[in-house]
Structures are given as C-alpha cells and as structure tokens.
Curated annotation (Swiss-Prot):
Top-level taxonomic group: Bacteria
Catalytic activity as recorded in UniProt: a quinone + NADH + 5 H(+)(in) = a quinol + NAD(+) + 4 H(+)(out)
HAMAP family given in the database record: NDH1_NuoC (MF_01357)
The enzyme's E.C. designation: 7.1.1.-
Coiled-coil parts of chain: none
Function: NDH-1 shuttles electrons from NADH, via FMN and iron-sulfur (Fe-S) centers, to quinones in the respiratory chain. The immediate electron acceptor for the enzyme in this species is believed to be ubiquinone. Couples the redox reaction to proton translocation (for every two electrons transferred, four hydrogen ions are translocated across the cytoplasmic membrane), and thus conserves the redox energy in a proton gradient.
Signal peptide interval: none
Subcellular location: Cell inner membrane
Main location: membrane
Organism: Delftia acidovorans (strain DSM 14801 / SPH-1)
Any one of the GO CC terms: plasma membrane
Pfam families cross-referenced by the UniProt entry: Complex1_30kDa
Protein name per the record: NADH-quinone oxidoreductase subunit C
Amino acid sequence: MMTAIAIHPEVLRDVVAAALGDKARSVTVALGEVTVEVSAAQYLEAMQVLHTAPDCRFEVLVDLCGVDYSTYAEVGREGPRFAVVSHLLSISLNQRLRVRVFCTDDDFPVVASVTSVWAGANWFEREAFDLFGIVFDGHDDLRRILTDYGFIGHPFRKDFPLSGHVEMRYDPEQQRVVYQPVTIEPREITPRIIREDNYGGLH
C-alpha cells in the first residue's frame, strides 16, 4: 500500500545519503527531484541498497537509459562521456529517485547490470547497449533490441551521422532486401527569418 503523502525532496536526499554512505558521490535536489550519483565500481551494490533499505524500498525500476555527454564540453563540462541514468519508484513509500553512474572508459563503456535487482532492467539495458554501445557486465543476453541484424555502430551516439551509414531496399532482380551506401544528399537548412513583428499573425 502506498503512503498518502510523498516524502519531501530534502528529506529523501538525507535518507538516500544515509543509506548509501560513501557509495554516494553526491546527492542533490533540483526542481523538486533527487539525483544520486554513484561510481561504476559501487553501482550494483548501491542499487541493491536502494532496493532493500527500509527507508528506501525502491521496488520499481521505471526507466534506465544511456546518455552521451560528449557535446557538454562546449559549455565547459569535463568528465566521462557516457552515463547510465535510472529512475526508481518506491510504491510503498511514495517516493522517486534518479540514479546516475558514469562509465570510466569512453572507448569501451561498461557498468554492472542490475537485472539481478530488477528483472525489468533486461530490455532497458539491451536498448542502452544497442543505441549507445554501453556494455552491462553480468547481463545474460546482451543483444541488440531495436536496430537491424548486422547493424554497425550505435545510432544515439552524438558522433553517429543523422543519415546513418547504409540504407536498405528491396532488389527485384535478387528478390531480397539489400544494403547499400546512403544516397541521401546533404542539404543546407536555412533558418526562418521573421521580417516584421506580426509576420504570419504569430504575435
């Protein structure tokens, strides 16, 4: 049964910090939401604590995704390129938490799988592997889940071309689907210019 009133974010921050101890690199509140950052080395252990600790009891993994922070350097951020972000829900305590863990190696990003804690992480982790190339150590079936068989690359990485590398079409002579280099021609996008304040009746 869920509690009627959600815990205050600042209180949840303190509860999470106390439960994780030195496993938490930081616990912050922004826009009424609590985010905890943990190290890759202690990620699985921290998630187990968040799942079972009496004041946490995050029974549900709502979402898990990869993030590519490579363009954040343009605004002065330094640090690892890839992170895994999870959103947890405690039904019994009516509280939510965001967990972020950075992969230590940009060339071969790896974090532990949390499928042993939440079985529902299975497809989430496969999606993050497929789209970002993040490897989840301990996942027993880490196959692509969205892209085609034989797909090369990871399309949500920010250095992956928007048009992709290949396209597929049906070849009537061979009577099968074939792959070929992308034939989309690059085009320049001209920004819309509003010439007067009430142009198009928008103002």
